[in-house]
Amino acid sequence: MATPSATRTIRNPKTRFNWRVSDIVRRSKSNWLSLKAKVTGRGYRCVALEGESEYNITVNSDLTVSCNCQDYDGSGHIGDLKKNTFEEVFFGPVATKLREDLAKGKIPIPVCSRCGDLRRMSRAESKQPLPKGRLPYRGMLLENTVRCNVDCIGCAREGAANVRTSKQMSLEELSKMADLAKHLGLQQIFYLNLGEPFLSPNIGQELPLLRSKLPDCRIVISTNGIVLNTDAKREAALSSSQILFSVHGINNEMCEKYMIRSSFDKAYAAMRDMVAYRNARGLKSPVLEWKYLLFNWNDKPATLRKAIEMAQEIGVDMISFWPTHNPFYGMSWRYRLGLLNRFGEKNWKGREWDFRTRGRI
């Protein structure tokens, strides 16, 4: 069975100020939530560890399993699929202790404090025996590689890469993960985590393999778009259900402020060419979405209007605007104050303009 292990030290960690602030906020919130549970007698539960989340549970590139999608230091590792079955990992001692600690009102790892799958129990629930939960079925993350060609200010990817024993999942391993997804009856696979999926040298085989074994599964990819630049990769991408292009601005300068080493010109061309490649084959899938993180340097109304016009011009299916708080100094106050409410419809992402239903701007 999988056994708890101490978090491995990250070699040469980056020390960006916003990461340090984020760590302080997480620790402070963890302490507050633990105190709140002690005073009220109400513990917590984790939707992901109950098997009811469509996100968060992640199979990493080295086949370790994490309970969350921001496991930069390995503190969320619940087991290793090279040593144990998924059932042994998911119901094993590490995951069980996380569930038990939460039920007692303890926040076992700081990332729990800001996780969307954390739920507060009622007093009645807190007095009941801890339910075992079930195996995930709604969705999981699958990380084919932890390598990336850009360096986002809000992402501690290099720390995670130093924790991984393998930075690239082999094709044989991926095939086994597809079999696992079929065994679990997963409704969705999010083919993403802390790396750039299209950097994998095997991407041309990976996506068709997943689709062949999981014909009815929704497969979602997130990419910065820069290396989705050949017909071979575009052909592989047709095996997915949806592709989110993370492009956070309308020019190189704007994008590179958050996503270092990025290129708006290349990413925009990648979106345009993927639309053309799909449409030339008479297809409507995958759904192609421009994912636009909102910061205080890219959120002026005129800028968003221009982004919508540019998205419309190349024919993507939608553009979505996502508020974020990392880095904290880049937070979009225009969004928080409701000054961007005329741009698309409100949903769980933030704001979204869907050209298929809303039409042209």
Identify the meaning behind each predicted range.
Residues 64, 96, 118-121, 249:
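Active-site/binding-pocket entry motifs
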Residues 1-84, 88, 104, 164, ...:
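Radical SAM enzyme [4Fe-4S]-AdoMet core and its adjacent flexible, acidic
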Residues 94-110:
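Immediate flanking context of iron-sulfur cluster ligation sites
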Residues 46-47, 75-78, 101, 117-242, ...:
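Conserved alpha-helical substructure of the radical SAM core
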Residues 42, 108-111, 144, 148:
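Short metal-coordination and nucleic-acid-contact micro-motifs, chiefly zinc-binding Cys/His arrays
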Residues 106-126, 292:
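Membrane-interacting alpha-helical segments
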